[in-house]
């Protein structure tokens, strides 16, 4: 058994090195930014998957073509072959690509990429190896100044463990980014349930929307590497017309809404939504007035602008079915500021608050922001607005990594300064996330 595990890890490391080598070659030779380099690499992975579905393989470069390009000469046959494949990719994934999209790699970078990947199958190789390699590859990019704001894996896994998704439950992230919450939910379900149909879960139960096509492609690729089935990752502005959003998720399993919403909506420097057409479709797009009974009523006056994450709160509650559960990352000010008392009233009117968990300031520093945040867990419950119930509240103090740009892991140590290890000899992270999860279960 140990030999199989070592072999699997070896395959993962080799594939990770291959991905990194390709990325570094493009970055060094083509003058693209690191984010642009990642985008081009993802395009090629989609092209390869399309080719692997065909009987006649076109994703290759022969020795003569490669030598020609390395000697600064063109190989029109090779370039045309790959461009034709990309055209088929655009047709297959029209929700993630535009007709005007092109592969923006130089002939040499494209040739090197195809050469590195042509003898490897994305569809038929081990899901564990390729999925883990791609996840490690992405985590390197996310922590290395790639310009995008992602959610730390530790926080994602924590939220999923709190809500404990089940195999038959529908899950959506309306601001999915690279798909972290969806992949973590999938892994949680597979780990805690035997004989689960992974294809059914991915094709029927997992949904992710993102306004950014490049980021949505990453989320889709992560699920495609788990199993090659139709996925429900879409490039959608989740704050636009609600009926339009619902059309994107219409299925037997989501007719009455979703069982679980997990999301980290854009906030901080994202600015405000000022489009009156969008604001008018949200209760929280209007101004609210406090009554003499310390309640709030919505007025007929639109806000001049509303921050994105507040509109996302309403949209997420809308997406839930009655009794559905939600976990969302929010700035601490939403729980404290007097000017947002109406928001807290709105949430309490439509949901039961399951818990609030405060995160340390350093949580998101390795991922691009120092905004203090908390996690809000709620259950949609519109029928019992007049009720009192105990509220779980906790504060995370140790997250298992440093609060700096690198976000290096921090491990538990004994009195001699030696790193503590578990029964499998793995170093034990210095964190209290797992303690809070157990506290919540016992609450």
Regions found by a protein language model. Name each.
Residues 25-29, 48, 116-121, 140-144, ...:
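Alpha-helix C-capping/helix-to-loop hinge sites
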């Amino acid at each position: 058994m140990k030999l199989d595990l070592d072999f699997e890890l070896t395959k993962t490391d080799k594939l990770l090195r291959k991905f990194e080598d390709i990325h570094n070659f493009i970055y060094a030779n083509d003058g693209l930014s690191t984010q642009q380099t990642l985008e081009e690499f993802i395009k090629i992975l989609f092209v390869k998957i399309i080719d692997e579905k065909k009987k006649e393989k076109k994703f290759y470069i022969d020795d003569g073509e490669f030598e020609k390009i390395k000697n600064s000469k063109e190989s029109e046959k090779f370039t045309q072959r790959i461009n034709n494949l990309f055209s088929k990719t655009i047709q297959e994934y029209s929700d993630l690509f535009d007709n005007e999209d092109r592969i923006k790699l130089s002939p040499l970078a494209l040739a090197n990429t195809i050469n590195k990947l042509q003898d490897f199958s994305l569809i038929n190789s081990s899901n564990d190896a390729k999925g883990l390699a791609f996840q490690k590859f992405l985590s390197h990019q996310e922590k290395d100044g790639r310009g995008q704001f992602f959610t730390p894996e530790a926080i994602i896994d924590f939220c999923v463990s709190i809500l404990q998704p089940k195999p038959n439950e529908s899950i959506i992230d309306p601001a999915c980014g690279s798909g972290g919450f969806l992949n973590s939910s999938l892994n949680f379900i597979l780990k805690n349930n035997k004989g689960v149909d992974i294809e059914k879960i991915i094709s029927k139960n997992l949904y992710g929307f993102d306004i950014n096509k490049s980021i949505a492609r990453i989320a889709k690729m992560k699920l495609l590497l788990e199993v090659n089935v139709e996925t429900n990752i879409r490039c959608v502005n989740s704050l636009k017309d609600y009926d339009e959003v619902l059309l994107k998720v219409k299925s037997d399993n989501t007719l009455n809404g979703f069982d679980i919403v997990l999301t980290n909506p854009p906030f901080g420097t994202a600015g405000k939504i000022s489009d009156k057409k969008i604001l008018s479709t949200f209760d929280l797009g209007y101004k609210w007035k406090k009554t003499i009974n310390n309640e709030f009523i919505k007025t007929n006056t639109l806000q001049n602008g509303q921050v994105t994450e507040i509109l996302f709160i309403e949209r997420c509650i809308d997406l839930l079915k009655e009794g559905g559960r939600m976990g969302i990352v929010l700035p601490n000010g939403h729980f404290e500021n007097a000017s947002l008392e109406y928001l807290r009233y709105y949430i309490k009117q439509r949901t039961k608050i399951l818990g609030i968990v405060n995160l340390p300031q350093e949580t998101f520093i390795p991922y691009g922001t120092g905004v203090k945040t908390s996690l809000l867990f709620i259950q949609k419950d519109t029928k019992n607005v007049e009720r009192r119930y105990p509220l779980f509240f906790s504060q995370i103090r140790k997250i298992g990594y440093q609060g700096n740009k690198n976000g290096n892991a921090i491990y538990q140590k004994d009195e001699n300064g030696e790193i503590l290890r578990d029964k499998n000899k793995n170093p034990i992270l210095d964190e209290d996330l797992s303690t809070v999860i157990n506290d919540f279960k016992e609450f």
